[in-house]
Amino acid sequence: MPAKRITDIDPLDRPREKIEKKGASALKDSELIAAILGKGTKNNDILTISSQVADLLKKDNLPSYDTLLRINGIGPTKAAVLMACFELANRYGTPAEKERIRITEPDHILKISEVTDLSGKSQEHFLVTTLNGASEVICTRTITMGLLNHSLVHPREVFADAITDRAAAIICIHNHPSGNPEPSSEDITVTRQLSEAGKILGISLLDHLIYTKGKVTSLRSLGYL
């Protein structure tokens, strides 16, 4: 069977296009690697190659140049590109020992740059923050953009990364460009739908926050969770 090409993937699901639309934080590890490498080989598609590299990162933290070369589809050029990325991350990345952000109150979400970056956005953005068992932030990702409704915000999309992160809980955040902090009927419907899905999956929806004018409104505090 011929290798699957990036052009065979739905444009909305292509890694580089997803970065343009949603930002790099919305991508899984394998998708980020695919965006870096660009394309696969005749015998091994880029998604397979990037998944194998992502698996190595989980097992070996930072694989060596020689280890990368053992992956079918990675030659000296791709290995060098990845090693350069690893080194940049090592030089400029957040120190591993830095304390993670812990969310125990709604306002604590304002410590996350992806949330405060919602200021001035003309469209609604729906974000999900995954948390470990100690309520520490694992990752914050943009799930969708546009008018919030239950058809756009599907539990499958919301919880997919939480499952990958092995998260214990999530917090959903979306902005109201109008500046009105009050939840709409659609906000409440989406919140309850996601809460029920979380109960089935064993991943709690701790809160759904509305971001406006540098502040957040908690749907849990309002009694909708």
Curated annotation (Swiss-Prot):
Q: Which cysteines are joined by disulfide bonds?
A: none
Q: Which Pfam families match?
A: RadC, UPF0758_N
Instruction: Mention one GO biological process in which this protein takes part, according to its record.
Output: proteolysis
Q: Which superkingdom?
A: Archaea
> Listed GO molecular functions?
metal ion binding; metallopeptidase activity
Q: Which residues cross the membrane?
A: none
Query: What UniProt keywords apply to this chain's record, in alphabetical order?
Result: Hydrolase, Metal-binding, Metalloprotease, Protease, Zinc
Locus of motif JAMM motif: 174-187
Q: Which residues form the MPN domain?
A: 102-225
Q: Give binding positions for Zn(2+).
A: 174, 176, 187
The Swiss-Prot or TrEMBL record describes its family as follows: Belongs to the UPF0758 family.
Q: Under which name does UniProt file this protein?
A: UPF0758 protein Mhun_2739
Q: What is the lineage of its organism?
A: Archaea, Methanobacteriati, Methanobacteriota, Stenosarchaea group, Methanomicrobia
